[in-house]
Amino acid sequence: MTSSPTGNNGDLATLYPVMTSPLRFCVLGDSLAAGVGSSREDDTLGRRLARRLRDAGHPVHLRNFGVPGARSADLERQVGVALGEGVDLALIVIGANDLAGFVAPAVGARQLQDAVTRLVRAGARVIVVPAPDLGIVARVPGPYRQLVSAASGHYAQAQTEAAIRAGGAVATAGPELAARFAADPALFSADRFHPSSAGYAVIADGLAPHVLDAARHLAA
């Protein structure tokens, strides 16, 4: 599964292991996973991260199973399809619709844990991107933003703990990313809810180190 990148003379020290067969990279989750709000398909998270992987020397076979409006309960079906086609690395972006639909954190976290467990048992590396801070969304009335942000953080924490219990890794957005989106309207699309192409670029930059690290471990 690995090769040893060397210099032109073939005798330099190995830098990083890379995949020699295509890395089966699957993106699962909701509208953020699907790329709603981006101007072009090439600007979606999956496409951007696949390019990062290829630039690092990993051949990639990308499949996107994200569905707008999906909640954690929908991961069961998405995971089933992904496993049927084969998956080495899975990126799960989920939680915003659970929050909007008032799904209890314990319920959504359990559904996420079940999904991650199935993928890990099948030999996949799994990276979970927890629920975003919905308090920064313009359509949330000002007086409620602090409350919504607190609920978002509570939900994301439950997801984080569930993903780790199941053997997955977690790529949290953190307050810095939320602050960046809150300060720059250009990072949102016209609906003022989903990221724009520029917003997806910012998110992909934050996720890339996690994805590349997972690929290196798979190739080792």
Give names to the regions the model predicted.
Residues M1-G10, D30-G37, F65-A73, L112-L119, ...:
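Short, mixed-charge, low-aromatic patches
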Residues M1-L28, A33-S39, R51-V60, G84-G86, ...:
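N-terminal secretory targeting modules
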Residues T14, P22-V27, L32-D114:
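Conserved SGNH/GDSL esterase-like catalytic core that processes O-acyl groups on lipids
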Residues E76-A220:
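Alpha-helical cap/lid subdomain in secreted, periplasmic
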